[in-house]
Amino acid sequence: MIVGRVKEVWRYPLKSMAGERLEGSPVGARGLYGDRGWALRDEEAGEIRGAKISPALMLCAARYRAEPAAEGAPPHADITLPGGAQTSTDDPRVNDLLSDLLGRRVTLWPLRPASDRAHYRRAMPAARLVGFLSRSRNFRRLALGAMRLAGKDKELREDFGREPGEPLPDLSALPAEIFEFTSPPGTYFDAFPVHLLTTASLDALARRAPDAAWDARRFRPNFLVETSGGVEGLVESGWGGRTLRVGGLRLRCEMPAPRCSMTIQAQRGLPKDPRVLRTIVKEAGQNFGLYASVESAGRVSAGDEVELL
């Protein structure tokens, strides 16, 4: 079934900064070549972090100087700071500039090999033990439930931007390694290598909250799919377990994407708008968009058909 066409292709050279809109890109097991090739380490917390360091990170933008390869170190990227000042990943001042902007000590890192597990490990005590136990989905579900009952879910509520009385998302379907590491080792994406969003979903929530600032850029998808006539509503939320053919690529639809506080923050060209997340929590079951993994590599370009198999 043809569900639409690729309207936009996006790559994000530096985790949590504004990305690059592309005409097309090769996609491998780790997603679009060069996607999230760089990230910041919060030296005070002792781990890799995204916009939870400071929402100001989302007011920055990054652009590669050269096209990335499938493997190996990412190319250097130019960075535009709020107000228009320029720096880059190879600027000797970049760590100081970003630390001053964010109000805490940070350092910039390219992707490290997956074997460098210490680089990706969470700073929390007993991260290795938690990672081992989290191989069981039942443990993940019970542990999150116990945190809620014990009132120890404050950090989760802050990260996910939940107000009192709002539910927390069910994170038990996320990869087990996310409970030990800040991202799957060898990557800087949150959970899965590809994130997809449809115009049908955007339109559906815009109808429910027409005064909110709905814009695909706010949700940082790799692919924005313009859905065909007759395809309406939160369609991708029902695609879990199915396969998508996107251009020359085949994707396995893994799970709906749980949304966090990043969606309400001001970004380049977009205002801060808490109504966005309030609507997602109330009207979309806390999820918006789709996480996917790569079944077979290929190239995707704007205009390519998207087929649900």
Map each language-model feature to its residues.
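Metal-cofactor-dependent catalytic cores
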Residues: 1-309
